[in-house]
Amino acid sequence: MTPNIYQQLGLKKVINACGKMTILGVSSVAPEVMQATARAASAFVEIDALVEKTGELVSRYTGAEDSYITSCASAGIAIAVAAAITHGDRARVALMPDSSGMANEVVMLRGHNVDYGAPVTSAIRLGGGRIVEVGSSNLATRWQLESAINEKTAALLYVKSHHCVQKGMLSIDDFVQVAQANHLPLIVDAAAEEDLRGWVASGADMVIYSGAKAFNAPTSGFITGRKTWIAACKAQHQGIARAMKIGKENMVGLVYALENYHQGQTTVTAAQLQPVAEAISAIHGLYADIEQDEAGRAIWRIRVRVNASELGLNAQDVEAQLRGGEIAIYARKYQLHQGVFSLDPRTVAEGEMALIVARLREIAEHAAD
């Protein structure tokens, strides 16, 4: 097998069965998207005009009034928060992230206060926001959301993520209704979501996506929504967004990646994964089945349960050996403490699932020696 470019640099080969994670480079970009990126990198353009044109093109896919491409989804959160606080006023933009004396509170659910590799609160603070949590970790009510709003409130933030608490939380409809009743912008962090239109259609004012996750774009993100608020986002380029700027090549790459996505993506079904699950279950001490994404997306994964008493190793041991081999195999490890890890097929290249099964078999055989 021909070494990839990272192996040529002296780094390990990685099999990514973890999903579209930043720590592993997020996603694999299609050749035609990279070709567009290369062409964009080799020419000059008026950046302001490119910002407007790419915003228009992105909005064709989202159904929004306008859009603004960012360097990543995390930058999008900071920029959207700054937009909500400053309303695009140049004097205020120049002061950010110092929002002293401004309405700067961002109201969110405690069950949505997550860490995706960095705390979401870091991005909010970077945009000048002060976090106001609503509810408890496992339950939030409409009256709690309403009572958190005052003259210092700048925006409401709704986070849609598999990291969030999935039960006992308020719905997007609750947030839309409360935001509109109080004439406040609603920001939705939909970084890894695949539905380009639903969140805008729900009534959100600024919806943030990662370009590199669901859409397999080069490193990028975008904010899509109401024209007045997107204009306020664009104004941040003369403030905090300058340190988060994205290059012309990745702006073009995102547009081409969205076109690819719009034309249709191949998905791995539960039925297609079943033979792999059966092969893993044939290994002593391992039991595999198929699970759907915890946030309800149409994503199917193989869940592997480790019987430590049978195998002689616990789930943490197996995951560590997968990662520590000659080929580093990364699995999803959110449930390791429950004796479970998962394999996400979306980022596994052809032939690599067989290598994963073979490595699991090897680990089990060595444990039996």
Swiss-Prot record:
InterPro entries: DgaE-like, PyrdxlP-dep_Trfase, PyrdxlP-dep_Trfase_major, SelA-like. It is an enzyme of class 4 (lyase). Gene3D superfamilies: 3.90.1150.180, Type I PLP-dependent aspartate aminotransferase-like (Major domain). It catalyses: 2-amino-2-deoxy-D-gluconate 6-phosphate = 2-dehydro-3-deoxy-6-phospho-D-gluconate + NH4(+). The keyword Iron-sulfur does not apply. Induction: By D-glucosaminate and DgaR. Disulfide bonds: none annotated. Its EC number is 4.3.1.29. Keywords: Lyase, Pyridoxal phosphate. The modification N6-(pyridoxal phosphate)lysine is found at K213. GO terms for molecular function: L-seryl-tRNA(Sec) selenium transferase activity; lyase activity. Its cofactor is pyridoxal 5'-phosphate. Belongs to the SelA family. Involved in the catabolism of D-glucosaminate. Catalyzes the conversion of D-glucosaminate 6-phosphate to yield keto-3-deoxygluconate 6-phosphate (KDGP). PANTHER family: L-SERYL-TRNA(SEC) SELENIUM TRANSFERASE (PTHR32328:SF0). This is D-glucosaminate-6-phosphate ammonia lyase. It comes from Salmonella typhimurium (strain 14028s / SGSC 2262). The gene is dgaE.
